[in-house]
């Protein structure tokens, strides 16, 4: 997905979010919004990356779209919960990405699909890419990832 000139919403302000912000800003989005239950944590992260690109922070309840991409980096899916954001942020042309993954849709992706999102992705690809990068660091060879991801999805009965 092309991220240049796109409006990106990043849910969560923990370690996973922090690791994603630099690479997201490197793609020159129109704006990156970090939203969190505690806005102070989002503001802290936005402050750290303020010189890297257009970034702002807000509380979940303050969010107003439209966004082109929503990334869920919260741990909510682990407990079957969904971040408390408005379903009005979801529309048919939005891309939704949950850093979590499982055999079926994550609770967040299931919720987004219910409200009309059609492009839905999970974090399995990120997991495999991280493993490939680690392998490259230790072995000097970067393995392909597409076939591994496809095979994992097939073997685990995933979409």
Q: Which residues fall in each region the model found?
A:
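Short glycine-/small-residue-rich Rossmann-like dinucleotide-binding loops
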Residues: 72-76, 100-101
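Short acidic low-complexity segments
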Residues: 52-67
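Glycine-rich adenosine-cofactor-binding loop
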Residues: 5-25
